Amino acid sequence: MTTQDELKRIAAEKAVEFVPENEYIGIGTGSTINFFIEALGKSGKKIKGAVSTSKKSSELLAQYDIPVVSLNEVSGLAVYIDGADEVNHALQMIKGGGGAHLNEKIVASASEKFVCIADESKYVSRLGKFPLPVEVVESARSLVSRKLLAMGGQPELRIGYTTFYGNQIVDVHGLNIDKPLMMEDEINKITGVLENGIFARDAADVLILGTEEGAKVIYPCQG
């Protein structure tokens, strides 16, 4: 039986085919992305540089001599490659288990195409089993948590974690996310929220799923 890491690697290696040469690209964060950076580094493909969403990804890119650039230095990105904690059939996602979802949304929005890579366990019919990360300003944490509680969620502070921007993460369990776009907007309207981990406005254009049968390329289904 194929292990989860092997499935992640299968998806990551397939994703290299979606990277155009001589362009700037965006790189996400997480264990599946670590496999992708390794595969890209070993592929021999030449890119102008990569905008990274985390220190860990930047360090790994440097190991493979892939130039890391700031988003402020480029006018746009050809493609953004990232993983997901959950992804549905419309390629809407929950992300942010690693706490980098604000940076990830910024870089995704600057990219012409979003390619999501994941193992098959992340492909779900409905979002919400994975707790939803919400980045909050520390002084508003209790206020935001009460609002999230009123929405039907069970907020829990991520103890000992601070985001790249110095904020806190509240992980919300039990939310009804049958309308991801509406829920994403509703949470972001709460004063004190910087960003939440629903990627509906910035849904993926392509999903590469690592399965027992190999890599499957999936496009959004709105039905």
From Swiss-Prot:
The keyword Isomerase applies. It comes from the Bacteria. SUPFAM superfamilies: D-ribose-5-phosphate isomerase (RpiA), lid domain, NagB/RpiA/CoA transferase-like. Pathway: Carbohydrate degradation; pentose phosphate pathway; D-ribose 5-phosphate from D-ribulose 5-phosphate (non-oxidative stage): step 1/1. Keywords: Isomerase. It catalyses: aldehydo-D-ribose 5-phosphate = D-ribulose 5-phosphate. GO terms for biological process: D-ribose metabolic process; pentose-phosphate shunt, non-oxidative branch. The active site is at E104 (proton acceptor). Its EC number is 5.3.1.6. Substrate binds at T29, G30, S31, T32, D82, G83, A84, D85, K95, G96, G97, G98, K122. Belongs to the ribose 5-phosphate isomerase family. Homodimer. GO terms for molecular function: ribose-5-phosphate isomerase activity. This is Ribose-5-phosphate isomerase A.
